[in-house]
């Protein structure tokens, strides 16, 4: 084979390649997740009033699939951090994020959640992205409902463009691994 022929060969790892059926399923899962967001509002300050107005009939967040807030992080896939987070609340917020099931997304709602706002002191966390990853930042003090809907549509576009896999590889059973180790030691 000539060197020119070798340059035309494309190699991929089997784990990274996606078949036709899996790509169709991924698009279907993306569409379903995009329009069925289960939100967990973590409201701590004045932005909470604007968050409630987004759910009112004038702006109607339910047409974007984020209708009912969940009151347990284990049932939610979208964490809406609404308002100022102080340093005493930071471990609680991180724990809430860790309790959420995969896939999960985070929206920083307002300037205080995004960058600490005008509370630049020792007690306020200067942006929630210091402790948890943030997918969408919604600016404003407080942000208008229209901005919130724009941020939600940005998140929906991001979710729709992601690759969604049905199931990841299963991890080895630790009990079975220990049993196999004990059996090999007895030989």
From Swiss-Prot:
* A Pfam family that the UniProt record links to this protein: Oxidored_q6
What exactly does this protein do?
NDH-1 shuttles electrons from NADH, via FMN and iron-sulfur (Fe-S) centers, to quinones in the respiratory chain. The immediate electron acceptor for the enzyme in this species is believed to be ubiquinone. Couples the redox reaction to proton translocation (for every two electrons transferred, four hydrogen ions are translocated across the cytoplasmic membrane), and thus conserves the redox energy in a proton gradient.
What does the record give as EC number? 7.1.1.-
InterPro entries assigned to the protein according to its UniProt record, in alphabetical order: NADH_UbQ_OxRdtase-like_20kDa, NADH_UQ_OxRdtase_20Kd_su
Subunit structure of this entry? NDH-1 is composed of 14 different subunits. Subunits NuoB, C, D, E, F, and G constitute the peripheral sector of the complex.
* Alphabetical list of SUPFAM superfamilies matching this protein: HydA/Nqo6-like
Q: Where in the cell is it found?
A: Cell inner membrane
One of the entry's Gene Ontology molecular-function terms is:
4 iron, 4 sulfur cluster binding
For this chain's record, the cofactor binding note is:
Binds 1 [4Fe-4S] cluster.
Protein family (similarity comment): Belongs to the complex I 20 kDa subunit family.
User: Which organism is the protein's source?
Assistant: Myxococcus xanthus (strain DK1622)
Supply the name of the protein.
NADH-quinone oxidoreductase subunit B
Q: Name one GO cellular component term.
A: respiratory chain complex I
- Catalysed reactions, semicolon-separated: a quinone + NADH + 5 H(+)(in) = a quinol + NAD(+) + 4 H(+)(out)
Kindly give the membrane topology term recorded for this protein: Peripheral membrane protein
| Requisite cofactors | [4Fe-4S] cluster
Amino-acid positions noted as binding [4Fe-4S] cluster in the UniProt annotation, renumbered to this chain: 46-47, 112, 141
Q: Name one GO biological process term.
A: electron transport coupled proton transport
Q: Which UniProt keywords apply?
A: 4Fe-4S, Cell inner membrane, Cell membrane, Iron, Iron-sulfur, Membrane, Metal-binding, NAD, Quinone, Translocase, Transport, Ubiquinone
């Amino acid at each position: 084979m000539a060197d020119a022929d070798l340059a035309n060969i494309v190699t991929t790892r089997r784990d990274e390649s996606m078949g036709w059926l899996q790509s169709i399923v991924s698009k279907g899962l993306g569409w379903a997740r995009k329009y069925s967001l289960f939100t967990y509002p973590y409201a701590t300050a004045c932005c909470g009033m604007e968050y409630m107005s987004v759910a009112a009939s004038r702006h109607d967040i339910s047409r974007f699939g984020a209708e009912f807030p969940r009151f347990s992080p284990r049932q939610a896939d979208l964490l809406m951090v609404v308002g100022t987070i102080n340093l005493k609340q930071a471990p609680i917020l991180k724990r809430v994020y860790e309790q959420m099931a995969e896939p999960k997304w985070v929206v920083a709602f307002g300037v205080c959640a995004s960058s600490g706002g005008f509370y630049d002191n020792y007690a306020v966390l200067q942006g929630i992205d210091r402790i948890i990853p943030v997918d969408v930042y919604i600016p404003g003090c407080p942000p208008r409902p229209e901005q919130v809907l724009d941020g939600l549509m940005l998140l929906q576009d991001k979710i729709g463009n992601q690759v969604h896999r049905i199931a990841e590889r299963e991890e080895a059973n630790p009990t079975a691994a220990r049993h196999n180790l004990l059996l090999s030691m007895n030989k």
